[in-house]
UniProtKB/Swiss-Prot annotation:
Its EC number is 3.5.1.28. Coiled coil: none annotated. The gene is PGRP-SB2. GO terms for biological process: innate immune response; peptidoglycan catabolic process. N-acetylmuramyl-L-alanine amidase involved in innate immunity by degrading bacterial peptidoglycans (PGN). Probably plays a scavenger role by digesting biologically active PGN into biologically inactive fragments. Has no direct bacteriolytic activity. This is Peptidoglycan-recognition protein SB2. Residues 40-165 form the N-acetylmuramoyl-L-alanine amidase domain.
Length: 182
């Protein structure tokens, strides 16, 4: 009974926007030499990972490790995104707040990168993913990591790419802080 109650409480906490820490999926801490972000930033750039989707913590942790390994092979300093959203509706810490990402070259020093795990050229992310991203943005504003007057753009608005997928981009256009230009 106590275990069930603990699991329910944990689920409620995650549902309220707890960020799953990087240490749950990556044993390597972020290097103290990683460039810092000047916060609050005014720009949130949305991506999709074009990987397999994930629907539970175990699957998502595997995908996160694969993404980080791919980014490291491509000579990134670490995983490129600040946060990732799993198909399980959880918010996974990548670089986290205050660290400059490597997700949109001309905009890394002035933005937070949020990646939806999966490919959204072929369909819309599940509603729990969309809600998790909105929750993360609220947390970022509350923690003064993102300006209250922030803008949301898709990666394709910063360079020639299909990212974050046409279906996710069309959804972003409905969000109140979406802008046609960064």
């Amino acid at each position: 009974m106590k275990l069930q109650l603990a699991l329910v409480l944990c689920g409620l906490t995650l549902a309220l926007g707890q960020i799953v820490p990087r240490s749950s999926w990556c044993p390597v801490p972020i290097s103290p030499r990683m460039p810092r972000l000047m916060v609050p930033v005014r720009l949130i750039i949305i991506h999709h990972t074009v990987t397999a989707p994930c629907f539970n913590p175990h699957q998502c942790q595997l995908v996160l490790r694969q993404i980080r390994a791919d980014h490291m092979r491509r000579k990134f300093r670490d995983i490129g995104y600040n946060f990732l959203i799993g198909g399980d509706g959880r918010i996974y810490e990548g670089l986290g707040f205050g660290i400059r990402g490597e997700h949109a070259p001309r905009y890394n020093s002035q933005s937070i990168g949020i990646a939806f795990i999966g490919n959204f050229q072929t369909g819309l992310p599940p509603s729990q993913m969309l809600q998790a991203a909105r929750t993360l943005i609220q947390i970022a504003v509350q923690r003064r990591q993102v300006s209250p007057n922030y803008s949301v753009v898709g990666h394709c608005q910063t360079k020639a790419t299909a990212c974050p997928g046409i279906h996710l981009l069309n959804e972003l256009k409905k969000w109140p802080n979406w802008r046609p230009k960064p």
